[in-house]
């Protein structure tokens, strides 16, 4: 596992949970994840769940993605999706507002791998170099991804060659993220 990425992700998650605690006096709250089972849930309201990150349980890799395309996925991406279970976290990187994606449970981890495979299928069909998403943005056509060739974190417009490098590594990107509440 890419330890620098794992450490940077845990550090950002601590910053996010700490900022939430400071602002709201509780663990993060999510309406979107209400009713979806997870080891992260610590309590529920009528229509939301309070959550805290939990250690990832299971095989710590995204080998299903590698097998589907006979490729080697950047080690940072393995670490990103298998360090912890947590809720998605809104954040800001420089001027870019985003939602950092996380796996909520083992079932969600399987779904994320299926979505990554679908993303790669589309890229292959359009003859684009492979990227693997890690965050969404308000504009549904823009995502934050890892370039699987270079390991750089990029902002890309889906279905196009339009890509902007944001950071040289995922660990660097995560270190510079700020929680957005």
Swiss-Prot record:
Alphabetical UniProt keywords: Cell inner membrane, Cell membrane, Membrane
CDD domains: Syd
UniProt-listed InterPro entries: Syd, Syd_sf
Any one GO CC term of the record: cytoplasmic side of plasma membrane
Membrane topology: Peripheral membrane protein
Pfam families referenced in this protein's UniProt entry, alphabetically: Syd
Localisation per UniProt entry: Cell inner membrane
Domain of life of the organism encoding this protein: Bacteria
Keyword Lyase found: no
Family in the record: Belongs to the Syd family.
HAMAP family, per database record: Syd
Protein task: Interacts with the SecY protein in vivo. May bind preferentially to an uncomplexed state of SecY, thus functioning either as a chelating agent for excess SecY in the cell or as a regulatory factor that negatively controls the translocase function.
Protein name per the record: Protein Syd
Organism of provenance: Salmonella arizonae (strain ATCC BAA-731 / CDC346-86 / RSK2980)
Gene name of the encoded protein: syd
